[in-house]
């Protein structure tokens, strides 16, 4: 849906690395979004066992269960053969926020002053969780404004959805369980405002 894919998103960043520093690309076993990396570090989870965020996977990596998860090896290989080869080292499943990513490790419990073994949630993006905090519900648009702006809506998963040109994705469970999360907006808003101030 939406018909767009940003240079800021998952596969664009990986492809950029492959083209500007192939040695780094070749040295990497897999790739993680920051929101997946932090819970993995806090829970001392191996890279091949990280529970990937549905929010990040769906909105930035084109993950959709109806399409067998991430884009196929063949699709990615059309962009670059090495990107296609990477597909097997990525992931098959994604999880909504609220699902356990694991338990807080002893090391991080000590550093943070928290009890060892408490649950650490699978992550979601700041705007999507901000929409939850702002009371997003069907029929209500929430606009999150910061370094970017995101317009977040939800629609029950039982409803048929139509293609909406220009949005950043429709992802099952990316905002609330049992709802599609719909995201639109403008990236780099804070940087653009800063540019205007300086110029």
Regions found by a protein language model. Name each.
Residues 2-124:
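Gly/Ser/Thr-rich active-site cleft segment
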């Amino acid at each position: 849906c939406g018909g767009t894919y940003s240079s800021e998103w998952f596969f664009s960043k990986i492809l950029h690395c492959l083209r500007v520093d192939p040695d780094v690309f070749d040295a990497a076993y897999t790739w993680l979004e920051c929101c997946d990396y932090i819970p993995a570090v806090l829970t001392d989870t191996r890279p091949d066992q990280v529970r990937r965020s549905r929010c990040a996977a769906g909105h930035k990596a084109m993950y959709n269960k109806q399409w067998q998860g991430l884009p196929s090896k063949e699709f990615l290989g059309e962009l670059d053969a090495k990107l296609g080869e990477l597909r097997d080292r990525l992931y098959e499943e994604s999880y909504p926020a609220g699902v356990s990513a694991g338990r807080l490790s002893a090391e991080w419990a000590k550093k943070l002053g928290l009890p060892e073994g408490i649950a650490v949630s699978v992550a979601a993006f700041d705007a999507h969780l901000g929409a939850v905090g702002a009371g997003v519900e069907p029929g209500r648009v929430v606009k999150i404004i910061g370094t970017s702006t995101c317009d977040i809506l939800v629609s029950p998963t039982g409803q048929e959805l139509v293609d909406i040109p220009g949005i950043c994705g429709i992802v099952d469970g990316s905002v609330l369980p049992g709802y599609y999360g719909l995201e639109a907006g403008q990236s780099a808003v804070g940087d653009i405002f800063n540019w205007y101030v300086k110029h």
